[in-house]
A protein has these predicted regions:
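Active-site-proximal substrate-binding core of FAD-dependent oxidoreductases
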Residues: 275, 295-329
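Core beta-strand elements of the Rossmann-like FAD/NAD(P) dinucleotide-binding domain
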Residues: 81-89, 216-225
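Beta1-alpha1 glycine-rich phosphate/pyrophosphate-binding loop at the start
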Residues: 1-46, 50, 122-125, 131-177, ...
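FAD-site-proximal beta/loop scaffold in flavoenzymes
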Residues: 92, 114-124, 226-277
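Glycine-rich dinucleotide-binding loop and its adjacent helix/turn
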Residues: 96-136, 140-145, 250-258
């Protein structure tokens, strides 16, 4: 809207704006953007207030079913039924999903009591349910660390947090505030090799890991009724694939140029759908840039073709965003490059 575009529509599948922030009731958000510490809902509310003040339209409880290469959006909700939109530009902001048990190849039965950390977070913080009493958490990503603290505060006993790698995947501040302050053990280079229980989890077996494989004879048993999985996030790009958006084999998100534009003219991407961010402040910065570039595209139309230079990663650099730049088009936008 600040770029001069009047007709803007936000499609949200949940019952309220804010996305994952609504279930993140812990503080630590907004230190970069607002120079103060906010909870997730407070941070989201700052932007929702801006959306309302600018008169930007949005549809809640609306599921986008398809995105075509010509930018036709097919969606549905209870009020409008099935409908199509034909925008001049689309910004992909679907976020990411947690890696489920099926992607982890953990042996054992499939009893109740196995949750991703984000699902458990929603159950506790928004639905008012406690998933279990004796908990083991696999994976030391930020969500897993935060849920170790949250479950403890709600009265559960967190037996340990196990991490496959020899280092934690979460922020140092979360290790200190969520584990150390509550006396929760962090078992590095360990993974779950078996889940016991038929109707409900009754226990799990941990083993030490070397070179990515469990070491025989190092198994340890934990009596628990709940296993939380915090084993990484995957950009949610079903719609991107349907439209023919080229995806990065490293991040799993769209491959974009310096304007955060995909290989489809007028289709942009920002946030965790592009690549997983550590801080929501960086998501906001990236989203603002994508919005500005989308507004430029609408005003000026498709940019003339020209050379596109891929960004090549050397030793020590896993990936960059953008994955390609157009000489002469970058301007100051490369200040947003992520490595």
């Amino acid at each position: 809207r600040k770029g001069g575009v009047q007709d803007i529509l936000i499609l949200e599948r949940d019952s309220e704006l804010g996305g994952i922030l609504n279930q993140c009731i812990h503080n630590g958000f907004g230190l970069h953007t607002f120079k103060e510490e906010l909870t997730g809902p407070e941070y989201a509310a700052r932007f929702i207030e801006q959306v309302e003040a600018l008169g930007i339209a949005y549809k809640l409880n609306t599921m986008v079913l398809d995105l075509a290469a010509d930018k036709t959006v097919t969606a549905m909700n209870k009020t409008d039924g099935l409908f199509q939109l034909h925008p001049k530009a689309v910004i992909l902001a679907m976020g990411c999903r947690e890696r489920p048990r099926g992607a982890l190849n953990i042996p054992g039965y499939r009893p109740a009591g196995i949750f991703t950390a984000g699902t458990a977070q929603r159950l506790v913080n928004m639905e008012g349910y406690l998933p279990g009493r004796r908990v083991v958490i696999l994976g030391s990503g930020d969500i897993g660390l935060i849920m170790a603290r949250r479950m403890t505060l709600e009265g559960a006993k967190v037996l340990c947090v196990a991490e496959l790698m020899p280092y934690s995947g979460g922020l140092k501040r979360n290790i200190v505030q969520c584990l150390d302050d509550f006396g929760i053990p962090l078992r590095l280079s360990h993974t779950v090799v078996d889940i016991q229980g038929k109707e409900r989890v009754t226990g799990i077996t941990l083993a030490r890991v070397e070179n990515g494989k469990p070491v025989p004879g190092t198994e340890e048993h934990y009596d628990c009724d709940t296993l939380l999985l915090s084993c990484g996030l995957l950009p949610e790009n079903e719609l991107s694939r349907a439209a023919g958006v080229a995806l990065s084999p490293v991040t799993g998100g769209p491959a974009v140029n310096e304007s955060l534009e995909t290989n489809l003219p007028g289709v942009f991407a920002a946030g965790n759908v592009l690549h997983v961010h550590d801080l929501v402040d960086y998501v906001s910065e990236e989203a603002a840039a994508a919005g500005a570039h989308a507004a430029d595209f609408i005003r000026s139309g498709e940019q003339p073709g020209g050379p596109v230079l891929p960004v090549r990663c050397e030793n020590g650099v896993r990936y960059t965003v953008p994955t390609a730049i157009r000489p002469g088009c970058a301007g100051d936008t490369l200040s947003l490059i992520h490595i």
